[in-house]
Design a protein with these regions (language model features):
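Cofactor-binding loop segments of dinucleotide-utilizing enzymes, especially the Rossmann-like FAD-
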Residues: 16, 36, 119
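A generic "binding-loop/recognition-motif" signal
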Residues: 19, 38, 182
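Anionic-ligand binding patches
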Residues: 2-12, 46-195
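Short loop/helix-cap segments at secondary-structure boundaries that form the rim of catalytic
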Residues: 22-26, 43, 66
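N-terminal beta1-alpha1 ligand-phosphate binding loop
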Residues: 2-29
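A short beta-strand-loop structural module common to alpha/beta enzyme folds
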Residues: 32-41
Length: 195
C-alpha cells in the first residue's frame, strides 16, 4: 500500500488549490504545502498536453536545489483545450462568460499534468478527459459566474459546482481530473516512483 511506502518520504505539494489539497487528504497522503510564484507562460508552438507538461515542470523547476533526500515534490497544471486553444483561468466576469459560452453545446478536453521530483529523479504524467456541455442560457451562465466566482478555474467552471450539475451532458475519462487532479494516475505513479 502507498501509505506504508510513503513513510520514508516527505511529500511537498506545490499547489494552492483547495481541491487538490483535499484530494491528497482523501488519498490519506500526508503532505506539506509549499508555494512559489511562477509566471505561467509557455511557448506558443506547444499544444494540448505539451502545455500542461511544460507548466507542471516549470513549477517544479522553481524548487531546483531546494529538495532534500526523501522529498517528493508534486506540481501540476490544468487547462481546458477547446478548438485548438488553451483556456486558462478567466481574468474577469466578461472573460468567464465568453469562455463558458464557447463551451456550450460542444465537447472540450480537460488536461492535467502532474510532475513528480526528487533530488535525483523526475517524472511527468498527464490525463485527458473529454467533457460535453449542454446549451446554457446567458442568464444561467451569468448566475453561475455571480454566485460561484470561477476565476480560479481553468475554462471558468467547476464540474463539481452548480454549472456542472446542470450543464455537463457527459464525460469520457476521469471526473477527478476535471476537478483538478487525476487521483488514480497520481496514486499509481507514486507507487511506481517510490519503488
Amino acid at each position: 500500500m502507498l501509505k506504508e511506502k510513503l513513510q520514508d518520504y516527505h511529500i511537498i505539494l506545490a499547489s494552492g488549490s483547495p481541491r487538490r489539497q483535499q484530494f491528497f487528504k482523501d488519498l490519506n497522503i500526508e503532505f506539506e504545502i509549499r508555494l512559489k510564484p511562477v509566471e505561467e507562460n509557455f511557448p506558443k508552438h506547444l499544444k494540448a498536453a505539451e502545455i500542461t507538461d511544460f507548466l507542471a515542470e516549470l513549477k517544479a523547476d522553481a524548487f531546483e536545489g531546494e529538495l532534500n533526500t526523501g522529498d517528493i515534490l508534486i506540481t501540476s497544471d490544468t487547462i481546458v483545450w477547446h478548438e485548438g486553444s488553451a483556456l486558462g483561468k478567466p481574468a474577469d466576469a466578461a472573460q468567464a462568460l465568453e469562455m463558458i459560452k464557447s463551451l456550450c453545446g460542444k465537447t472540450h478536453e480537460v488536461i492535467t499534468s502532474v510532475s513528480f521530483r526528487t533530488p535525483d529523479k523526475k517524472k511527468t504524467v498527464n490525463s485527458t478527459t473529454r467533457v460535453s456541455f449542454s446549451e446554457l442560457s446567458n442568464e444561467e451562465i451569468q448566475y453561475y459566474i455571480n454566485e460561484y466566482r470561477p476565476f480560479d478555474k481553468a475554462g471558468a467552471y467547476g464540474i463539481q459546482e452548480w454549472i456542472g450539475l446542470i450543464g455537463i451532458d457527459h464525460i469520457e475519462g476521469s471526473y477527478f481530473n476535471v476537478v483538478g487532479l487525476p487521483t488514480n494516475l497520481v496514486y499509481k505513479t507514486l507507487l511506481e516512483f517510490t519503488d
